Amino acid sequence: FLMCVSFSFSCKEGVKEVRVLKLAHGLPPSHSVHLGLLYMNERLKELSGGKMSMDIYSSAQLGSENQCIELLQIGSLDITKVSSAALEGFADPFKVFGIPYLFRSREQFFEVLDGSVGKQILGSTEPYWFRGLAYFDSGARSFYTVNKQIRTPEDLKGLKIRVQKSPIAVEMMKTFGGSATPVDWGELYTALQSNVVD
């Protein structure tokens, strides 16, 4: 996951008004990322002396990840939290995060993200009028199914697996023998109920 910010918001020196930034994401209010964003808002208020705050829109209220990126580009949104898959269509460097088993350990993963390579990737969207601010760790890749345990890649053969809308994710699933089915996070529950995905 990444935090991205629009180039369109500005802070005028000497202005005493509270600057309210609009932030949107697709996760429910109970999700740990949303709780982290609430904490971030409290810190923003504290560190700005009450001159800045955020209105946080969860559960894809303002649209899908791609729609939030588009809102960012036109200045209708100040900050969004999206997956790297949503950014692949804007900047090729984000495709690296879809490659399975790329990093040897969590330590190496964070070493890369916190270093010069991670900073270059965050900045790679600048030609598209937004910039990455920070990375969120969403944990290891996991597969969950309605009625079958997945212990090895071979267990994915023949299953309809929900993937993000990412060419890398689709190709990975094909390599594992599963049927890749791109579904937005907000539509996943319905897709499972209607057997669109397993």
Which stretches of residues belong to each language-model region?
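Short, low-complexity disordered leader/linker segments with a strong preference
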Residues: 1-20
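Nucleotide donor/acceptor-binding cores
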Residues: 19-21, 158-159
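Short, well-ordered beta-strand segments
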Residues: 22-24, 55, 80, 162
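Extracytoplasmic "Venus flytrap"
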Residues: 22-39, 59-64
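Short, polar/charged alpha-helical segment
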Residues: 30-55, 167-171
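Contiguous mixed-secondary-structure segments that line small-molecule binding/active-site clefts
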Residues: 41-42, 73, 83-181
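Alpha-to-beta junction loops
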Residues: 50-52, 68-82, 160, 178-180, ...
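Short helix-initiation/N-cap motifs at beta->coil->alpha
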Residues: 57-70, 165-168, 181-194
